[in-house]
């Protein structure tokens, strides 16, 4: 995929490890997800105003995201996900949280939680939230944890996801690290996705 934010091009893979069974002999589904992002911004944009006492390095354009997707259809109307995740960015500009003096870090863990509540056969309420464990993201006035809430509409051939969120990016490499807006300040965006399953 490609995102305008940071001019990020990304590729990903997903591997299903376990499949939940209807009799709950296997109560969860488990999948491994990983993505690599490459920013094709100019090097001046990547390095910003930093005084460089090092050589420019093409590797600084890359970032990586890895996640386990632990999901369960708890009942006919409730599904839940836990998303332990790890983010690594090869290069970051120096930044300090003014509230706790913690420095931003290249790599850190986060935990996502997601859920779906089915109202009818075709209409569901959906939501997800990510909490970043690095001290830099705790009580930070400039960076917030991303939260999205919305509805999912199934029309037979397509699935429409309509949601409100404080995140700007659509892919993990952007929204986990760079969500600057706050729900409490009314800084909310509306977005939608359309999914279509093809069988060959």
Which ranges hold each PLM region?
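Repeated loop/turn-to-beta-strand initiation elements of outer-membrane beta-barrel proteins
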Residues: 20-23, 41, 77-80, 121-127, ...
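Surface-exposed extracellular loop regions of Gram-negative outer-membrane beta-barrel proteins
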Residues: 111, 116-126, 131
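Residue-level detector of the transmembrane beta-barrel scaffold of outer-membrane proteins
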Residues: 12, 29-33, 79-81, 124-126, ...
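Residue-level signature of outer-membrane beta-barrel architecture
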Residues: 15-17, 72, 117, 131, ...
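Hydrophobic, lipid-facing positions within transmembrane beta-strands of outer-membrane proteins
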Residues: 9-11, 64-68, 109-113, 145-149, ...
